[in-house]
């Protein structure tokens, strides 16, 4: 009852780059998780099934990546980690991890509030989504009605 069955967020960056991020997970529908990056020379489409396509602005296919014969990104990440450990090096993904997490938080804020969210708004927000007191007896903030149905969430409300 507390999550939307679909989301759409448009991320705009200072460089002028735009990312359209969308997902749908409604029962009985085509499920879709997709990011589309729009740049000055073309469009990158990152589908949830791992296929990446790059097209110019006229729609001509410039590149198609199919991951069938490649290692998973998780394995690549582990290979880099193990190599770093063996060589005595270190991997510091702190900044990219924090930025990616903040991007997700901002996307969630925009989707649920229906408002434009900018970095400063989000980083200075005092929104708290966690109940004050959590115990095994804490009631969820939203409960179903007498028919077991939840109120439908509406952006901005």
Predicted ranges, named:
Residues 1-53, 58-157:
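Contiguous beta-strand/loop segments that form the cofactor/metal-binding neighborhood of enzyme cores
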């Amino acid at each position: 009852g507390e999550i939307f069955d679909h989301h759409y967020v448009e991320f705009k960056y200072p460089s002028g780059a735009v990312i359209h991020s969308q997902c749908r997970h409604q029962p009985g529908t085509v499920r879709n998780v997709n990011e589309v990056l729009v740049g000055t020379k073309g469009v990158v489409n990152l589908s949830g099934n791992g296929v990446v396509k790059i097209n110019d602005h006229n729609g001509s296919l410039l590149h198609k990546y199919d991951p069938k014969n490649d290692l998973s990104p998780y394995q690549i990440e582990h290979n880099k980690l193990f190599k770093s450990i063996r060589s005595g090096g270190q991997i510091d993904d702190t900044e990219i991890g924090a930025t990616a997490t903040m991007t997700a938080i901002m996307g969630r804020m925009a989707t649920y509030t229906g408002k434009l969210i900018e970095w400063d708004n989000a980083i200075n927000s005092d929104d708290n989504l966690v109940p004050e007191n959590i115990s095994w007896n804490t009631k969820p903030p939203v409960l179903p009605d007498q028919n077991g149905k939840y109120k439908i969430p509406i952006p901005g409300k």
